[in-house]
């Protein structure tokens, strides 16, 4: 398939949330684990920072990638959604994944994807992890797509987990209270792995503390940090919180 044909096929695998509603939301990570087994576990070859949150996770992910790149690391960045080109989701040091790699990945594995009903998101994550592993990057910044606990990215064991903030988003899938949504996003907290919390409320802080305690994970609150001001192309007062988190 050509690149446009490959994209057309990929986008046809998008979950039809608008038509199916909550039933289109996969309830576990079985498919992703199956995919990683099939690909030879590229995720286990990566050093990662995992970023979740309602708002600010994209900006924070890009800032983290920029800081680490300036420090001399080869940095993979996986984010979603894209603005113009699907390849914006997967970058190394700011350079988009090549069209040929996308086409070859899909063409090589299409039969497996179809046989196992892989979703667009699962295939995108598999593509990113496979690309980063083959390019032998130093570190990957992985942004959660939706929620956290059941997101396709939540198969990594990161160096640190980051949760920027909690708002009422995707309530049909994640719950209709801040505490319920916080619990879903706190699902990225791993055993003995530190977690940084960008912002919290009286409803969400107990959730973060309880989840971190259950996982024996050190927890750090960005609000406790007196951040040194540094220049950024990202404008808006809310970016101050993102800078503190980073």
Go through each PLM region and give its residues.
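A general structural signal for well-ordered alpha-helical segments in protein cores
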Residues: 7, 32, 61, 102, ...
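N-terminal-biased segments
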Residues: 2, 7-26, 86, 142-146, ...
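Acidic, Mg2+-coordinating active-site environments of NTP-dependent enzymes
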Residues: 46, 118, 136-143, 158-245
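ATP-dependent carboxylate-amine ligase catalytic core
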Residues: 22-29, 33-46, 70-156, 174, ...
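Short functional linear segments
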Residues: 1-53, 60, 66, 70-71
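Aromatic/hydrophobic pocket-lining residues that form π-stacking "cages" and hydrophobic walls in ligand
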Residues: 64, 128, 208
